[in-house]
């Protein structure tokens, strides 16, 4: 930490927001957003395909512009901010990490399901060997108990991870659920690694949960300007800064500048506002990975079944990131029920 901030903010609008934009960012948008966030004092800006390095694919959706080109542009544009990139083992490769560093990325964020931290070991090791700052993401953190999450965090820290995040991928955690998990990681990791929190707005608690995380000891917090992220979006950075200013938590980000960036630069690049609607609420309530939203809407249109029912059943099946294709099976199941006159259950 430096004297500039008590908590370091990472803006994920150019990565998590890629889900909302169906990975269709163009260089002009990325350059303008990076410049505005950098000028406002945002210390870390994450840039990649929504599903991380190598995510551009038939399964996840193809990028309009190469993520490596966007990382390079972001690094060339930012005067002070560091450029982070996300990587999911099994989606991206070690070579992708090296290329991202060559293009100016300096923070490598490795994401795994919350029970599978062991698959990150070699990638975290490589990142440290390359001299990159390392962050670990334990996704779908609501699905396991705090002590089990802490044990997974220990695996990442021992592999060289410098900050392990409690990642509320579904926006399903509620206040104490965040505080308990962050506190468990802080107790387990001590001085070995920092703890971070990444929230979503699917139950409308992105900002409140982030405050709980900081009070429990988190030193890094994610958000997206204008909630530009998957599902109902992430905690809006401009609101986070306003709240943190009010409670005396230093971030180094100027509230008025980030509010201007959200309104004047980021919003025009968004296809629509990220909404807390029925689909998003169902994801938070049922514990569904936030990036499932656009996939569910697509299958809803294709098969003529309600997206919210698809999402609810995805939660019942406890699907995780990477299992988006199972939404097709669920859609066909609901379609058969409709044709036979069955009424879909809400429970």
Swiss-Prot record:
Native source organism of the sequence: Mycobacterium ulcerans (strain Agy99)
Residues engaged in binding Mn(2+): 16, 198, 200
SUPFAM superfamilies per the UniProt record, alphabetical: Aldolase, post-HMGL domain-like
Marked site (Transition state stabilizer) residue numbers: 15
UniProt-recorded name of the protein: 4-hydroxy-2-oxovalerate aldolase 2
Catalytic residues of the enzyme: 19
Keywords: Aromatic hydrocarbons catabolism, Lyase, Manganese, Metal-binding
Entry EC no(s): 4.1.3.39
GO biological process terms on file: catabolic process; L-leucine biosynthetic process
Pfam family, one: DmpG_comm
Catalysed reaction, written as an equation: (S)-4-hydroxy-2-oxopentanoate = acetaldehyde + pyruvate
HAMAP family: HOA
Family matches, as NCBIfam families: 4OH_2_O_val_ald, PRK08195.1
Family the entry assigns: Belongs to the 4-hydroxy-2-oxovalerate aldolase family.
InterPro entries: 2-IPM_HCS-like (IPR050073), 4OH_2_O-val_aldolase (IPR017629), Aldolase_TIM (IPR013785), DmpG_comm (IPR012425), DRE_TIM_HOA (IPR035685), PYR_CT (IPR000891)
One Gene Ontology MF term: 2-isopropylmalate synthase activity
CDD domains, alphabetized: DRE_TIM_HOA
Residues binding substrate, per UniProt: 15-16, 169, 198, 289
Transmembrane segments: none
Residue ranges of domain Pyruvate carboxyltransferase in the record: 7-259
């Amino acid at each position: 930490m430096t004297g500039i901030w008590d908590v370091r903010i990472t803006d994920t609008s150019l990565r998590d927001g890629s889900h909302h934009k169906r990975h269709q960012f163009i260089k002009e948008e990325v350059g303008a957003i990076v410049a505005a966030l950098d000028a406002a004092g945002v210390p870390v800006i994450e840039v990649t395909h929504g599903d991380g390095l190598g995510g551009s694919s038939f399964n996840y959706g193809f990028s309009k512009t190469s993520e490596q080109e966007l990382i390079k542009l972001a690094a060339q544009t930012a005067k002070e901010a560091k450029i982070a990139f996300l990587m999911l083992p099994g989606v991206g490769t070690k070579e992708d990490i090296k290329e991202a560093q060559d293009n100016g990325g300096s923070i490598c964020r490795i994401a795994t399901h919350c029970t599978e931290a062991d698959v990150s070991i070699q990638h975290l090791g490589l990142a440290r060997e390359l001299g990159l700052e390392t962050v670990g993401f334990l996704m779908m953190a609501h699905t396991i108990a705090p002590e089990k999450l802490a044990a997974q965090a220990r695996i990442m820290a021992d592999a060289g991870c410098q900050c392990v995040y409690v990642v509320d991928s579904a926006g399903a955690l509620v206040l104490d659920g965040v505080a308990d998990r962050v506190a468990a990681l802080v107790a387990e990791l001590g001085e070995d690694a920092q703890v971070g929190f990444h929230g979503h707005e699917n139950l409308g608690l992105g900002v409140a949960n982030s405050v709980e995380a900081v009070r429990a000891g988190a030193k890094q917090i994610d958000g997206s300007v204008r909630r530009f992220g998957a599902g109902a979006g992430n905690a809006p950075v401009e609101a986070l800064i306003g709240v943190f200013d009010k409670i005396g938590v230093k971030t180094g980000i100027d509230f008025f500048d980030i509010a201007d960036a959200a309104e004047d630069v980021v919003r025009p690049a968004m296809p629509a506002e990220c909404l807390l609607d029925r689909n998003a609420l169902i994801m938070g309530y049922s514990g569904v990975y936030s990036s499932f939203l656009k996939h569910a809407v697509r299958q809803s249109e294709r098969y003529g079944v309600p997206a919210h029912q698809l999402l609810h059943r995805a939660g019942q099946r406890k699907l995780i990131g990477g299992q988006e294709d199972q939404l097709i099976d669920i859609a066909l199941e609901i379609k058969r029920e409709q044709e036979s006159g069955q009424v879909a259950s809400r429970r």
